């Protein structure tokens, strides 16, 4: 085993001074951490830490499988997914499994298979986690040097980073292959109201793909969240997968440059803080994606977005009053602006009333009625199809505005359905988790930097309350 320095030197955070750093146990005497400090006891025990990570993966996959089967068991095909509190089946449906035209579920068997596969996988991971936590070697460096590591070994750390990047790249390409070769994925923009299709004409132009990154994050622009066709999404995954795999190979083959060795803190806690920071960013981006994007998260499965429900309400009443004889092109509303239609700041014809603020919504049921200058008056008079009316009435009554006690829908909409949209659940949970991960990032980054600077003492364990309490046994 390569020991680059004394272990005492390597672990700067000073905890209990018991004179030994024997890498045995699970107790406070040998590790300096009490049982409730969790994986801190395993900082120098690579074998045990492997067990903790594999067991954690097993718990995650077990939840996925069990929750998947729970949703299948409770699923009612006659109701939309978003009315049933489902968050996993919409993801499977978006990948094209079990659904047909219009997002109608025609076969639940693929969902059952997915749940069972995850349960079986979780059993394998659970066994591996228990094995490595209880029976396997405490450290991997001696017996399996390829899997062993020392936190300070910069070259080994970037090799591990490279392996992770390659795995992420393979994950991105799995979606690409599903969309191109294995049955396709669900396209909410398919003519007539959405269908499963294979993606044939990928967007690989770097100016388009990386153009998303250069967009403003604000309304009408919307950064990467504004993507609204599957060719761009799958093309983006080709780019991302390629970059991850090439970057992974690069990190495996190279050693960190001098500037990187100087700029970064190279300790286990520092790597933890970097990972938490990255996950926090992912959480915030996912929050915005599921809240605003109805292409990657089709409204047929997740329910309408907030702007979509609002625009659908305006559209529904335009249809109703036009049938009753209103001239929707010129009718004046209570504020003197157009009651049904008005102009946006840049001159497009948009829906009037309170929904004017959502004028940059794009949705598959609405786009056929647009012309070169926004909503086309002649199309609104002649071309509205029954499926567009049905869908907008459905979305109008299912705004993603439910609270925890489920007083759902727009307050002024008497037909609103009492439910909490999966968009609300997923956006809120990812925002909250993203925030907590960010706090964890700051906490561990601060500790890691202080330890590297040599002045982190940790909690003074002489006066720690738990030490003066009666032992549990």
From Swiss-Prot:
Alphabetical keyword list: Acetylation, Chlorophyll, Chloroplast, Chromophore, Manganese, Membrane, Metal-binding, Phosphoprotein, Photosynthesis, Photosystem II, Plastid, Thylakoid, Transmembrane, Transmembrane helix
Bound cofactor: record note: Binds multiple chlorophylls and provides some of the ligands for the Ca-4Mn-5O cluster of the oxygen-evolving complex. It may also provide a ligand for a Cl- that is required for oxygen evolution. PSII binds additional chlorophylls, carotenoids and specific lipids.
Molecular function via GO: chlorophyll binding; electron transporter, transferring electrons within the cyclic electron transport pathway of photosynthesis activity; metal ion binding
SUPFAM superfamilies tied to this protein: Photosystem II antenna protein-like
Propeptide: 1-14
Transmembrane segment boundaries: 69-93, 134-155, 178-200, 255-275, 291-312, 447-471
Compartments, record wording: Plastid, Chloroplast thylakoid membrane
Pfam families: PSII
Annotated Gene Ontology cellular component terms: chloroplast thylakoid membrane; photosystem II
GO biological process: photosynthetic electron transport in photosystem II
Topology class, membrane: Multi-pass membrane protein
Binding site for [CaMn4O5] cluster: 367
InterPro entries: PS_antenna-like (IPR000932), PS_II_antenna-like_sf (IPR036001), PSII_PsbC (IPR005869), PSII_PsbC_sf (IPR044900)
Positions carrying N-acetylthreonine: 15
UniProt function note: One of the components of the core complex of photosystem II (PSII). It binds chlorophyll and helps catalyze the primary light-induced photochemical processes of PSII. PSII is a light-driven water:plastoquinone oxidoreductase, using light energy to abstract electrons from H(2)O, generating O(2) and a proton gradient subsequently used for ATP formation.
Subunit relationships: PSII is composed of 1 copy each of membrane proteins PsbA, PsbB, PsbC, PsbD, PsbE, PsbF, PsbH, PsbI, PsbJ, PsbK, PsbL, PsbM, PsbT, PsbX, PsbY, PsbZ, Psb30/Ycf12, at least 3 peripheral proteins of the oxygen-evolving complex and a large number of cofactors. It forms dimeric complexes.
NCBIfam families in UniProt: psbC (TIGR01153)
Protein name as annotated: Photosystem II CP43 reaction center protein
